[in-house]
Amino acid sequence: MAIRQLPEILINQIAAGEVVERPASVVKELVENALDAGATRVDIDLEEGGVRLIRIRDNGGGIAPEELPLAVSRHATSKIASLDDLETVATLGFRGEALPSIASVSRFTLASRRPDAEHGSALQIEGGRLGEVMPRAHAPGTTVEVRELFFNVPARRKFLRAERTELGHIEEWLRSLALARPDVELRVSHNGKPSRRYKPGDLYSDARLGETLGEDFARQALRVDHSGAGLRLHGWVAQPHYSRASTDQQYLYVNGRSVRDRSVAHAVKMAYGDVLFHGRQPAYVLFLELDPARVDVNVHPAKHEVRFREARLIHDFVYRTLQDALAQTRAGALPADVGVGGAAALGIGAVAAQGGGSYVADAGAGHPGAGSGSGYASWAPSQAPLGLRVDEARAAYAALYAPAAGSALRDDGQPVLSGTGLPATAHDSGVPPLGYAVAQLHGIYILAENAEGLIVVDMHAAHERIGYERLKQAHDSIGLHAQPLLVPMTLAVGEREADTAEREADTLASLGFEITRSGPQSLHVRSIPALLANADPEALLRDVLGDLREHGQSRRIATARDELLSTMACHGAVRANRRLTVPEMNALLRDMEATERSGQCNHGRPTWARFTLGEIDRWFLRGR
């Protein structure tokens, strides 16, 4: 077949195959055009999931009558004029492909009016064939009407899903837009009935967050806002216990544009690390802002992907920002406490450095109420400052556990508790977040009372996290040591792996590897991380090189180290049926409040739960 120039209509239909995947793609392109035109209100009318009708009306700047034919021609745009503009583009659209592509596969009408014009104008296109520009009554702004999508491309139309499915894709994209632009009012109708309205609000509004993702997400989300190196990351991340089975609540925006990026997703997953239960996904709404010249948005026709010019810097910035935010999720902290004042907001102060108590040898049978035990190093009752002076704290405990006048003693000589509850200070502002221990349930759970109600703590999970964080701090302070191999190893690798090893020699050395390149496809390994001396060095090194090539860094060594320390902490934690004394339980609560990530154990399970007095009252139908 001879080479020939394709007709314009066919060219547009081929372009539509990249830009117009389904009705949601049409809505995305048209609404983004409206926002680029300065619209503050957008009305979206749909019929049959957008297959029969998509109508987008906005109150933006409008289009002049003489520019209407130009607006639906290929590669015509008002947003860029030079390569410099393309490299620093800040608008959502810039290719000039959307309108002609959509018009080539639908019955298309474009109507618009400039604010200073006496009347509007309209242009009709059917299957890519232009009509005449005609005057029309129209409010300032633009209306785009798309009817019978893919009417002239039956092969594309038959691949569309059911009406409910197509509508669901549109609603999901509108949710994403509503999160990014809370200042814009969005009104949606389907088959002639109003289906959703997003009211305009303040930028980064908590109200819009709850309206879009639900009150559960908004109630426990942590606010993040950090700047550095010309970057700013802000938004919300869900606390680890609010995890998902899928990635349906992961929203990333780069300079206001909703995108998917593997590097950032990897950084977020790493930040959640050992606080997320196995197989669960984090939820977040994150806005990354940077100079447009540092990111290439001209990567994908639908602009779903971007390419960062400093991908490693972005990865590290996101990872460290979120890791620091999640580290403040101490047990007892409310979402509002985290990131606003850190430990100081919880009244913890220097507790983290002091540990809130010290370990002593197990008192065994000589310790009243200690039980049989399982090698648990019991807690000395020395506590870090909690807002109460030492004499006040001791008086509070004495008031709680001292026998009432004339009370009998148990057979083991311990006093029978009077049942008077917490001391008078229990409802004062000086009560620590996890309150004071009241009892132990089945040797597994600590029951404590705080100002809001009942606190239930899984003592093994909590102690496991405390021990784990202390082990990590100890190892972080001494760094990773390298252990020389008795017989240096020659490793056959691919050329790309060898190039990575040579380029990242300093990074590998910091991880404990001493490696030199001995050939185009071979490496000479002289030492490996001492902590992982029993691991398979060949498999470990290949994994690390793969991480460095894909993400610019590797936490595989740290992850393997953390798994080892986690196992050590798990074996050293207090076991079920170990009876703790009240001072031991309270010391454990204080250490939880002072320990980073103590809301989850090393495996991502929750360590504590709060039941407010109002919730408990509802169980018993009180106040009704």
Swiss-Prot record:
GO CC term, one of those recorded: mismatch repair complex
GO biological process terms, semicolon-separated: mismatch repair
Xref: CDD domains: HATPase_MutL-MLH-PMS-like, MutL_Trans_MutL
Entry function: This protein is involved in the repair of mismatches in DNA. It is required for dam-dependent methyl-directed DNA mismatch repair. May act as a 'molecular matchmaker', a protein that promotes the formation of a stable complex between two or more DNA-binding proteins in an ATP-dependent manner without itself being part of a final effector complex.
Family: Belongs to the DNA mismatch repair MutL/HexB family.
Entries under PANTHER family matching the protein: DNA MISMATCH REPAIR PROTEIN MLH, PMS, MUTL, DNA MISMATCH REPAIR PROTEIN MLH1
Identification of the protein by name: DNA mismatch repair protein MutL
Organism name: Xanthomonas campestris pv. campestris (strain ATCC 33913 / DSM 3586 / NCPPB 528 / LMG 568 / P 25)
Gene expressing this chain: mutL
